[in-house]
């Protein structure tokens, strides 16, 4: 997780930095492909590309019955996660303030908004599919 976060944080991807946003999109697309997602990159001419990652569920569709594992009603329906790939930092911020960890605190442009969220969503989906 931290290696992926470091890769993403060390890429300038401010809202006006199409090249950086496209790099983040490509990295995230590859990560989702590794997990068996069907990936589509939506190319945009003047702004950063977008990524759509789809994967079918692993259980039966929800029919109101109880889960054989827990006895609880489980919904094996759809999950939608929406994230942005850009940050609010200007070009050059990644070089001036690269990803670092001091104690239990990670810093760098986009660590909180939004790159840790990109990594967190990927790992949350991995965990859901492992259930």
Predicted feature residues:
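Acidic/His- and Gly-rich active-site-bordering loop/insert found
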Residues: 1-111, 130
């Amino acid at each position: 997780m931290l290696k992926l976060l470091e890769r993403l944080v060390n890429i300038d991807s401010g809202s006006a930095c199409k090249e950086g946003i496209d790099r983040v999109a490509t990295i995230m697309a590859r990560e989702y492909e590794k997990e068996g997602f069907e990936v589509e990159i939506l190319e945009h001419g003047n702004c950063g590309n977008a990524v759509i990652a789809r994967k079918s569920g692993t259980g039966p569709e929800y029919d109101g019955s109880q889960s054989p594992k827990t006895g609880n009603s489980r919904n094996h329906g759809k999950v939608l996660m929406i994230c942005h790939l850009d940050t609010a930092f200007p070009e050059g911020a990644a070089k001036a303030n690269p990803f670092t960890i001091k104690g239990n605190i990670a810093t760098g442009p986009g660590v909180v908004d939004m790159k840790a969220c990109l990594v967190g969503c990927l790992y949350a989906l991995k965990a859901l599919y492992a259930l």
